């Protein structure tokens, strides 16, 4: 997720917390700077439900994906954020060998 595009993931996390449903989920959350990071309390609570959050100031690249999600080839990816970020992430994942059928996208334009 990029920037405020993390909002749909906060909703998913709240659902898991409320239903006490465990999920093997890894959230890669990038932001331009630390002051833009939102929903930290929600994601902290989601760790009780099996979520792991990896915060990144700056751009998520292939090495970061490999480091944080070693089993990336078997995962389903949900990408939400500004269109340029979503398209770049999708291309990057396809380049890593992730099936395009395992990549779900949501363009989140934010307030701009």
How does the language model describe each region?
Residues 1-112:
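FNR/FR-type flavoprotein reductase catalytic core
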